[in-house]
Amino acid sequence: MAELVTTATDGTHLTALDNGSGPTLFLVHGGSGDASSWDGVIPSLVNDFRVVRMTRRIYAPGAGTPQAHSMAVEAADVLAIAGLLDRPVFLVGHSSGAVAALEAALRAPGMFAGLFLYEPPMPTRSLVGAEAARHARKALAAGDPGEAMRIHLRDIVQLPAELVETLVADPKGVAVFASKAAGQVADVDALDALGVGVDRFRRLDVPTTLVEGEMSPAHLRERLADLAVTLPQAQVRTLTGQGHAAQLTAPEVLADAIREAAERVLG
């Protein structure tokens, strides 16, 4: 495994892990994650693909409280890493990382042979965080990361209440969330700052696989459906029995879906 390093236009150091050889898969993790979020997925891919996994700047070690963060910054970071890679590049994103991937592709569609977007929480008809994001930010500022986590999972992600309480009752889980909380708040704010609507993607004529979990929250599936009728070359893949975190609950299933979509595009 190698590490790729480059510098963003504002001087921020960007890193990515580089495994395997073959056609290039470029993976962008979701909220509160990092390059290791894909650890369960890549063993099924690295024998046939070069797999590059970036760590998004707001979740990098020592990132602190992000200043003036936006999806434009995220997209530029994706493009900076993509510029280091041999083409063709098949771009994969999960959750807010899928939004960053989509925004990057919109800015430079020629850089990517295809897209694989797993439940991007795009504000298609409504904002993602809205009032709940303000409540989560307030709880975090008050020194209560557990309550901020509860609000995020219950009111923004919209997980079932009983599952949320189980997760919040786990001190290790709360500690992990607390370590990523500033980035997660900035992430949701950046999503909402995009504004409601997706008409701009009608011109993005790149083969796109939109992926949903059968058990995922309804709002994520609705947002995905809105993108499906907007993107010119979109098709939807449903992961049976899965929710919003198949990279953890069924990594081989997700890897198979990535492989199938990539081979369809890359040949």
Roles of regions detected by a PLM:
Residues V5-Q67, R87:
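Conserved HGGG/HGGXW glycine-rich cap/lid loop of the alpha/beta-hydrolase fold
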Residues T55-A60, P121, T240-Q242:
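Short beta-to-alpha linker loops that shape the active-site pocket of alpha/beta-hydrolase fold enzymes
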Residues P232-G267:
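Catalytic active-site module of serine/aspartate enzymes centered on a nucleophile-bearing elbow/loop
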Residues L27-G31, S95, G213:
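Glycine-rich His-Gly loop
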Residues V73-V89:
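Conserved acidic catalytic loop of the alpha/beta-hydrolase fold
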Residues P88-S126:
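Conserved hydrolase catalytic core segment
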